[in-house]
């Protein structure tokens, strides 16, 4: 399924709204990942031996903002480019680091759930099934691009 004009508009409009609060939403996004899958904490070197709350961890804050922005911005470009657009070196790096950390399909699903919950909370009563479907499609395409790089890296 391609990314439709309507899906692009839904993602773009909600992203424009969410951009006003990226630091807070990014922390919420990562907090949800850790809430859904507490063992994910061990996948991040800056969280492994820490009992700090996510909002008190500057490395997590920086990482959360980077991941959240990249996820959302790649979704915005999906319709225009017809594919996930992340710099080639960035995509290769993402594939490599995800392979190194032994990220598997269930991990991608946790991140997807956290993303959808974050967008739902941020957009409030604007959240509808079609917005959920739009963000799901956008995320699935990003996850597929990362997985393809993981497979390429593993085969090399």
UniProtKB/Swiss-Prot annotation:
It holds the Pfam family Globin. One of its GO terms (molecular function) is oxidoreductase activity. Gene3D superfamilies: Globins. GO terms for cellular component: cytoplasm; nucleus. It is found in: Cytoplasm; Nucleus. InterPro entries: Globin, Globin-like_sf, Globin/Proto, Leghaemoglobin-like, Leghaemoglobin_Fe_BS. Binds 1 heme group per subunit. It comes from the Eukaryota. Its main location: cytoplasm. The record marks 132 as: Homodimerization. A motif (Homodimerization) lies at residues 35-39, 105-117. Its cofactor is heme b. Heme b binds at residues 45, 59, 63, 98. Residues 2-151 form the Globin domain. Its EC number is 1.7.2.-. Keywords: Cytoplasm, Heme, Iron, Metal-binding, Nucleus, Oxidoreductase. It catalyses: Fe(III)-heme b-[protein] + nitric oxide + H2O = Fe(II)-heme b-[protein] + nitrite + 2 H(+). Phytoglobin that reduces nitrite to nitric oxide (NO) under anoxic conditions (e.g. during flooding or in waterlogged soil). May not function as an oxygen storage or transport protein. Has an unusually high affinity for O(2) through an hexacoordinate heme iron because of a very low dissociation constant. Homodimer. Belongs to the plant globin family. This is Anaerobic nitrite reductase HB2. The lineage of its organism: Eukaryota, Viridiplantae, Streptophyta, Embryophyta, Tracheophyta.
